[in-house]
């Protein structure tokens, strides 16, 4: 029987005890890409923050490889899951390579010393995101788009079984958006990594997703294959499009 990497059970999420979304049901297997879509403020980031343990569920449970999230130690979780968020991290005198190398720390000893193999993994992670040319630059001095690529490299460097990304295509030009999604697809297909990612671009979501979870303006949740979710009527309803329509041919709202 194939293992399930991420599964929710009667999940309710929100803030300060107030439920924002309830009855959230998802199931992600190794090698699958789940894309969360929906308008701003719908709750995509809130769901992701519960998966990565930044927030605690108000109700129900989240299971990672059959274990509740609260049963993992911090180090165990870091070896299992890597995360790319939209929030900017604070760094002091760190090069881009230093930031990427942080992805290896769950595997290091008490002193945090990297082995030769660790250093090779750092280099390979930088290469995958086309960032070897900026590895020695100060992380605080590079562009937002370059920072996003470095944060993806750090996540890759962790060698995760699950990767969670919150709007990773923000700040990227179209070339680097496509490159990023190609990397995620490669991780899913070749390494059997389970990918959970939120995206704004419906047309990109339709191309990369194995499954889609769409959170509507009215907090309704639709889950299914892209071909069943990305229909003119369903997307128009979920996004509350009253003066325009979703064009499934072009993957855009008009």
Each language-model region and where it sits:
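Catalytic Walker B motif of ABC-type/P-loop ATPase nucleotide-binding domains
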Residues: 163-166
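H-loop (His-switch) and adjacent beta-strand-loop-beta switch element
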Residues: 212-225
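Conserved ABC ATPase signature
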Residues: 138-142, 146
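Conserved ABC transporter NBD signature motif
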Residues: 60-68, 77
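Conserved ABC ATPase "signature" region
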Residues: 101, 116-134
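Helix-to-loop junction immediately C-terminal to a conserved catalytic motif
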Residues: 52
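The feature captures the beta-strand-to-loop junction immediately N-terminal to the Walker
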Residues: 37-39
